């Protein structure tokens, strides 16, 4: 499969991706996946959870002494909050199926009664009295799935509540930790939608804290929530895709050509195979993060961000790792990347759009030979190389993000990519470029505290947030986000392809280049 012309890219036909009522009850709707959904919904991979999302949160009990928290009553409170959230965002209860087409089918079925809805919520929330962390549980779950050869698609959302107590009815001491692992099937959400939903749950659960009737659920008019499903993204764009012409076709071809070229480009050498998803994490302190941001603004200007610097550091660390002696004067780094597509949706839809909404851009850094530096070089030489790379990166994003049709482009090229990966599940040949995604500031979606709604008192403090995605393709996926002014870098990888020591060393190199940029 090639991307030599726009003829390789079938046109977008909105009617193919709209919700349709199925069955005679009027309680079930379905639609076909489109765009990035089609990639993460590929049957072989989705059945094995190979793109699943996890958000690991660590909370501290800061409730007043009069508020008793146990794993069991937290479970009951989160069940009720989940029911409220389901009414507003039914994506959390969607399911997946497949037929003879590449894109999967998403189905939503409204519960028949409040009792069946409560049974669904009970099955989504689990508790464990344990000293394990949420990330420990992630590893354990993936190891168990692999050992059992489980091919059951993951639910749209599940919660696992953990605390180091004797039983699920043991009071959780003040200042003790409650870890919550949110597990999502990526088909139904992107990272932003998932974070928004977690934030909603943290706000909604406050309504049930301290209530004597917290086990009682309110009556919900099930069936009415179907109208709250995120509308088809193809019908939510600011523009009419039927008006798109040759400029759109040319840009689609430019992206798919870059995508295919990326599969064959210079990158990290990997061992073939598929084993378990793993993650290494580096948390910069708030002081380090603030100093880096200040340096970026001072050296480069107010339009630059820590994300530009991180992408630059990733490329410098790659060159330092490879130490190529055959770089030509005109060799470039090209990497497709993922971008939040909500800015291209209509304003009345964008802020409340929880389903997958990712589009595509291409980062291009010119003249790699001029930025091939090492940590042993003078700081000023490293800084100049980082500045040069940052300017190339910002220019790349500007050239792509200024296109009014970029979300439509993402839908079309990701449809192509899904078919490409369906035909060739491992498109890389011995080497793979790292992929960078900036997730931004978590406070945009998730509150610092869970409050008791009736009193306004803080009950649980959200101390940390870690976001991981199961990795199956043999590249290193590097993510950046922040919480309470402190930035976190993590690398997600598959341990068939790389050793933990290799990945740790590469992550440390990225961090060192970023820290070298400080004033």
From Swiss-Prot:
Gene Ontology terms, MF aspect: acetyltransferase activity
Summary of the knockout phenotype: Leads to the accumulation of deacetylated calonectrins.
Pathway: Sesquiterpene biosynthesis; trichothecene biosynthesis
Keywords for this protein: Transferase
Primary enzyme class: transferase
Key word GTP-binding present: no
Binding site for 15-deacetylcalonectrin: 414
Upregulating conditions: Expression is positively regulated by the trichothecene cluster-specific transcription activator TRI10.
PANTHER family the UniProt entry points to: CHROMOSOME 7, WHOLE GENOME SHOTGUN SEQUENCE-RELATED (PTHR42034), CONDENSATION DOMAIN-CONTAINING PROTEIN (PTHR42034:SF1)
Additional remark text: Trichothecenes are sesquiterpenoid toxins that act by inhibiting protein biosynthesis.
Family affiliation: Belongs to the trichothecene O-acetyltransferase family.
Its biological purpose: 15-O-acetyltransferase; part of the core gene cluster that mediates the biosynthesis of trichothecenes, a very large family of chemically related bicyclic sesquiterpene compounds acting as mycotoxins, including T2-toxin. The biosynthesis of trichothecenes begins with the cyclization of farnesyl diphosphate to trichodiene and is catalyzed by the trichodiene synthase TRI5. Trichodiene undergoes a series of oxygenations catalyzed by the cytochrome P450 monooxygenase TRI4.
Protein name: Trichothecene 15-O-acetyltransferase TRI3
Species for this entry: Fusarium sporotrichioides
Gene name per UniProt: TRI3
């Amino acid at each position: 499969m090639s991307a030599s012309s726009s003829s390789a890219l079938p046109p977008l036909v909105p009617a193919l991706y709209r919700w349709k009522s199925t069955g005679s009850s009027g309680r079930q709707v379905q639609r076909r996946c489109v765009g990035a959904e089609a990639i993460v919904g590929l049957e072989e991979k989705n059945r094995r959870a190979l793109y699943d999302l996890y958000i690991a949160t660590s909370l501290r009990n800061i409730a007043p002494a009069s508020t008793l928290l146990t794993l069991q009553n937290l479970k009951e409170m989160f069940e009720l909050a989940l029911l409220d959230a389901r009414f507003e965002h039914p994506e959390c209860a969607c399911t997946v199926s497949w037929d003879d087409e590449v894109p999967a089918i998403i189905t939503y079925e409204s519960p028949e009664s409040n009792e069946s809805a409560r049974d669904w919520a009970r099955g989504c929330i689990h508790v464990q009295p344990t000293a394990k962390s949420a990330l420990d549980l992630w590893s354990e779950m993936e190891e168990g799935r692999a050992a059992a050869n489980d091919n059951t698609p993951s639910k749209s959302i599940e919660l696992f509540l953990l605390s180091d107590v004797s039983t699920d009815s043991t009071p959780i001491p003040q200042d003790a930790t409650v870890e919550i692992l949110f597990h999502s099937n990526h088909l139904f959400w992107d990272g932003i939608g998932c974070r928004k939903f977690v934030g909603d749950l943290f706000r909604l659960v406050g309504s049930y804290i301290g209530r004597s009737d917290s086990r009682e659920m309110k009556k919900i008019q099930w069936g009415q929530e179907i109208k709250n499903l995120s509308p088809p993204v193809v019908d939510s764009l600011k523009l009419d895709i039927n008006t798109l012409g040759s400029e759109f076709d040319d840009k689609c071809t430019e992206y798919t050509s870059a995508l295919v070229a990326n599969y064959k480009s210079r990158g990290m050498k990997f061992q073939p195979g598929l084993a378990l998803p793993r993650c290494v994490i580096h948390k910069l302190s708030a002081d380090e993060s603030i100093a880096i941001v200040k340096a970026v603004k001072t050296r480069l200007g107010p339009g630059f961000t820590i994300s530009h610097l991180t992408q630059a550091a990733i490329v410098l660390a790659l060159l330092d790792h490879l130490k190529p002696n055959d770089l030509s004067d005109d060799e470039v780094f090209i990497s497709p990347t993922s971008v939040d597509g909500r800015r291209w949706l209509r304003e009345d839809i964008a802020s409340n759009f929880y389903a997958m909404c990712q589009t595509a851009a291409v980062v291009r850094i010119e003249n790699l030979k001029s930025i091939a530096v090492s940590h042993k070089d003078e700081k000023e030489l490293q800084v100049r190389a980082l500045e040069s790379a940052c300017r190339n990166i910002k220019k790349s994003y500007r050239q792509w993000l200024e296109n009014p049709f970029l979300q439509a482009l993402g839908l079309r090229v990701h449809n192509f990519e899904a078919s490409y990966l369906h035909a060739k599940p491992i498109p890389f040949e011995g080497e793979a470029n790292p992929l960078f995604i900036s997730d931004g500031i978590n406070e945009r979606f998730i509150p610092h505290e869970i409050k008791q709604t009736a009193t306004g008192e803080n009950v649980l403090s959200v101390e940390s947030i870690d976001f991981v995605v199961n990795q199956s393709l043999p590249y290193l996926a590097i993510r950046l986000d922040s919480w309470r002014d402190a930035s976190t870098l993590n690398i997600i990888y598959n341990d068939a392809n790389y050793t933990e020591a290799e990945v740790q060393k590469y992550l440390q190199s990225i961090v060192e280049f970023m820290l070298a940029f400080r004033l």
